[in-house]
């Protein structure tokens, strides 16, 4: 499964590096992709989607399968809210939220949920033939 990520402060990049996935691209590297992917992003300001992520999704949302978001619990209701906004705007599941660069349990949860999405997508693709 392809993981596309945006890491303004480095937290999301550190999280991605701890997962078992090697098929990962930054937003810049993913420009022009034409395959299913999961996006992982941080949240900026008062619970907003970073502009580069919004612009990327405006061009490439057709293959978006799910989202995961990083945030800081100090922001209360705005914690990792970019994930909520992407999920509702693009009608994809929010896999999870994790704080800053995540902990070991977050990494395990992410790995499991990405596998579930990947298996579901594979079944749906096979059944459509």
From Swiss-Prot:
It comes from the Bacteria. InterPro entries: Flavoprotein-like_sf, RNR_Ib_NrdI_bac, RNR_NrdI. It holds the Pfam family Flavodoxin_NdrI. GO terms for molecular function: FMN binding. One of its GO terms (biological process) is protein modification process. Probably involved in ribonucleotide reductase function. HAMAP family: NrdI (MF_00128). PANTHER family: PROTEIN NRDI. This is Protein NrdI. It comes from Macrococcus caseolyticus (strain JCSC5402).
